[in-house]
A protein has these predicted regions:
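Terminal peptide-recognition signature
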Residues: 10, 14, 28-29, 47, ...
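Short, Asp-centered acidic motifs that coordinate Mg2+ and/or phosphate
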Residues: 44-46, 70, 116
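Catalytic-core regions built around general acid/base machinery
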Residues: 32, 80-91
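Conserved CoA-thioester-binding segment of acyl-CoA-metabolizing enzymes
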Residues: 1-50, 86
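Crotonase-fold acyl-CoA enzyme core
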Residues: 86-179
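Glycine- (often His-adjacent) and acidic-residue-rich active-site loop
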Residues: 49-85, 103, 131
């Protein structure tokens, strides 16, 4: 996290793990959103991902390594991540998601929570939950139908269709494609 000239830059920084969300990242995300929302000097927030992609969703490999099962781990992760998303949705300053590469699962939900979504031409958007045998999370089951309508949201969720940046723009999921 850095703040320059009133603009806060919050970068998901797990590039070697596709910026997937694990407990430490979820906790850091929540803490950062709380602090930035309380900072009167922040007039805008830009969300991005380090490395080759924005965010590939939850860290499923980490979930599977839990000795006592993933349930308690995931519950703690979700508590922090969802609390951060709720604050982000009502953030007192405009939120811009700068998406490149994949925005999958909860990563897609995170991007779509922003007020403005600017995507690189190489961006791809996918729900990814059904491929992993999971139900939608990360706010996607609420925000997606509100942005693009129920029929298209069901298509993306149930068929696990991947959208290009151009298709996401056509669907109304993003604001513009960066050139």
């Amino acid at each position: 996290v850095r703040v320059e000239d009133g603009v806060a830059w919050l970068t998901l920084n797990r590039p070697n793990a596709a910026n997937t969300i694990d407990r430490p990242l979820a906790a850091a995300f929540h803490k950062a959103i709380v602090e930035l929302n309380d900072d009167a000097n922040v007039r805008a927030l830009v969300l991005s991902g380090a490395g080759k992609m924005f965010c590939a969703g939850g860290d499923l490999q980490r979930f599977a390594r839990e000795e006592d099962g993933a349930s308690a781990y995931v519950e703690a992760l979700i508590a922090d991540f969802h609390a951060g998303l709720a604050l982000l949705e009502n953030f007192r300053a405009p939120v811009i998601a700068a998406v490149h590469g994949a925005a999958a699962g909860a990563g897609m939900g995170l991007a779509l929570t922003a007020d403005i979504v600017i995507a690189a031409e190489n961006s791809r958007f996918v729900m990814a939950y059904t491929r992993a045998g999971l139900t939608p999370d990360g706010g996607t089951s609420w925000i997606l139908p509100h942005l693009i309508g129920l029929r298209r949201a069901l298509e993306l969720t149930l068929l696990n269709r991947t959208l290009t940046a151009a298709e996401a723009l056509d669907f109304g999921m993003i604001t513009e494609i960066a050139t």
